[in-house]
């Protein structure tokens, strides 16, 4: 066994009919964790449904159906391997809660793969004012996904098929609009592909002899290649934030007989170790960590990305709950937010939003109503430049700086300090009406909280 490959998370974005599912299905199918038996079963079912209907998308539809029904499917089905990386597709749109997931997401994507359809009239539909292509790309950039790969799909259905002119036209237009969003097109590979036929997916296509390959320039090093797989292999692996202070948002708190209280969550930044004195905000409870476990094995330290359970001393299940954040009591401990300033982008709200609006915010694992206390300024969502002070209201498409006040105690952080705790989705009318990034937090000095005896004792050591 060689050295373990690096794990990378990607998110696949693009318009409904761009062929995302087929393209993603193709990668998972050819390089992924789906075993032969499952594939044969899918193929047989597809053949029974009318033989031509088997496409790679079928694989994804089966997986999606299982995901939607709440069956925890074997997560390896959403993984595939490249020469350098193990890649996990953390979400693909078309899923009801895609936008919310992308924000509160179980993990941050290291790279977004944007699929645009090259077929006649299709590209135009996806890129039109209300097409989702723009919204998804804007969202990815706003949420800190700084690497982008573009697959110009369905090259087999251009006029004429595999048209160089069409590919160049689309590349030019997409470059212009990702540049407006904030991406630098020189760093973005554009790959002409057919997710169904497999052109330029894993192997260079013989149908496009004119395509000499993609080239990118970036300060971390230039790269070039021909296929989509090679482009994925050129992703720059993220620096995992182990050096930052600990932040661990709780997903659940269990009471386990004979052990005691066990909070469960994902380490977002920093390191969690047995023996540490942790503080939970906004509950303001401090105690000692007795042990840390992942997949029923004791750990000496848990790192960013690890989903762990940890046993805490002298704390009841009533003291802490989902949405609380654990941190190191001696190193920038988490605190309750009295209020915070955020940059929000209104995505789809049927009316006008004015001061006093109080929707529910989903930020990390917290789910709390927050009031838009003050609309400070309307800004240009691309450049961030101020357009007007104290706007009376905001509508779909607007970006603004707002002051927000949580309706109940809540712990959030600025995006620049702790990214996963600094981005949120605004939910109303069962949909995501806005997304936001926290610029600054007014932290509330807590009145004396509960400090357990074990914490006091361990603190004296």
UniProtKB/Swiss-Prot annotation:
Tissue: Oocyte.
The keyword RNA-binding is assigned to this record: no
Modified residues annotated as N,N,N-trimethylglycine in this record: 2
Record domain tr-type G: where: 5-242
Location of region: G1: 14-21
Region feature (G4): 153-156
PROSITE patterns from the UniProt entry: G_TR_1, G_TR_2
Region described as G3: spans on this chain: 91-94
Any one biological process term the GO annotation gives: translational elongation
Gene3D superfamilies cross-referenced by the UniProt entry: P-loop containing nucleotide triphosphate hydrolases (3.40.50.300), Translation factors (2.40.30.10)
Region G5, residue ranges: 194-196
Region (G2): 70-74
Gene Ontology annotations for the cellular component aspect, listed alphabetically: cytoplasm
CDD domains attached to this UniProt entry: EF1_alpha (cd01883), EF1_alpha_II (cd03693), EF1_alpha_III (cd03705)
Modified sites of kind 5-glutamyl glycerylphosphorylethanolamine: 301, 374
Amino-acid positions noted as binding GTP in the UniProt annotation, renumbered to this chain: 14-21, 91-95, 153-156
This protein's UniProt keywords: Cytoplasm, Elongation factor, GTP-binding, Methylation, Nucleotide-binding, Phosphoprotein, Protein biosynthesis
Molecular function per GO: GTP binding; GTPase activity; translation elongation factor activity
Cell compartment(s), UniProt: Cytoplasm
Similarity field: Belongs to the TRAFAC class translation factor GTPase superfamily. Classic translation factor GTPase family. EF-Tu/EF-1A subfamily.
UniProt function note: This protein promotes the GTP-dependent binding of aminoacyl-tRNA to the A-site of ribosomes during protein biosynthesis.
Name assigned to this protein: Elongation factor 1-alpha, oocyte form
Name of the gene this protein is made from: eef1ao
């Amino acid at each position: 066994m060689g050295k373990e490959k690096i794990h990378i998370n990607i998110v696949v974005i693009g318009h409904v009919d761009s062929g995302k599912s087929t393209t993603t299905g193709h990668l998972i199918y050819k390089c992924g964790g789906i075993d032969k038996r499952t594939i044969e079963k899918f193929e047989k079912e597809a053949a029974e449904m009318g033989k031509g209907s088997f496409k790679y998308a079928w694989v994804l539809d089966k997986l999606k159906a299982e995901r939607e029904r709440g069956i925890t499917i074997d997560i390896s089905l959403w993984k595939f391997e490249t020469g350098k990386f193990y890649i996990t597709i953390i979400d693909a749109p078309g899923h009801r809660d895609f936008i919310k997931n992308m924000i509160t997401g179980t993990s941050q994507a290291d790279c977004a793969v944007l699929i645009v359809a090259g077929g006649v009239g299709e590209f135009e539909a996806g890129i039109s004012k209300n097409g989702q292509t723009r919204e998804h790309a804007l969202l990815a950039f706003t949420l800190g996904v700084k690497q982008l790969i573009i697959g110009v799909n369905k090259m087999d259905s251009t006029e004429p098929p595999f048209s160089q002119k069409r590919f160049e036209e689309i590349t030019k237009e997409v470059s212009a609009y990702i540049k407006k969003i904030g991406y630098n097109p020189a760093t973005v590979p554009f790959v002409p592909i057919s997710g169904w036929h497999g052109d330029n997916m894993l192997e260079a296509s013989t149908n496009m002899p004119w395509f000499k390959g993609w080239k990118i320039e970036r300060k971390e090093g230039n790269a070039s290649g021909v296929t989509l797989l090679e482009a994925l292999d050129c992703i720059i692996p993220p620096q995992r934030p182990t050096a930052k202070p600990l932040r661990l948002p709780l997903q659940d708190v269990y009471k386990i007989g004979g052990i005691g209280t066990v909070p469960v969550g994902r380490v977002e930044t920093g390191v969690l170790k047995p023996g540490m004195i942790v503080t939970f905000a906004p509950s303001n409870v401090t105690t000692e960590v007795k042990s840390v476990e992942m997949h029923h094995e004791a750990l000496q330290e848990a790192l960013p990305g690890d989903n762990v359970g940890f046993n805490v001393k002298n704390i009841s299940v009533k003291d802490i709950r989902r949405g609380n954040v654990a941190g190191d009591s001696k190193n920038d401990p988490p605190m309750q937010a009295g209020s915070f300033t955020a940059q929000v982008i209104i995505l789809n709200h049927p009316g006008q939003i004015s001061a006093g609006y109080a929707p529910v915010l989903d930020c990390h694992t917290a789910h709390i109503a927050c009031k838009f206390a003050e609309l400070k300024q309307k800004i240009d969502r691309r450049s961030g430049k101020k357009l007007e002070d104290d706007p009376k209201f905001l509508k779909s498409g607007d970006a603004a700086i707002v002051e927000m006040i949580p309706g109940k105690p809540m712990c959030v952080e600025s995006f620049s300090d702790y990214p996963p705790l600094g981005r949120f989705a605004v939910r109303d009318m069962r949909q995501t009406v806005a997304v936001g990034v926290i610029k600054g937090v007014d932290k509330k000095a807590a009145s004396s909280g509960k400090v357990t005896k074990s914490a006091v004792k361990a603190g004296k050591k």
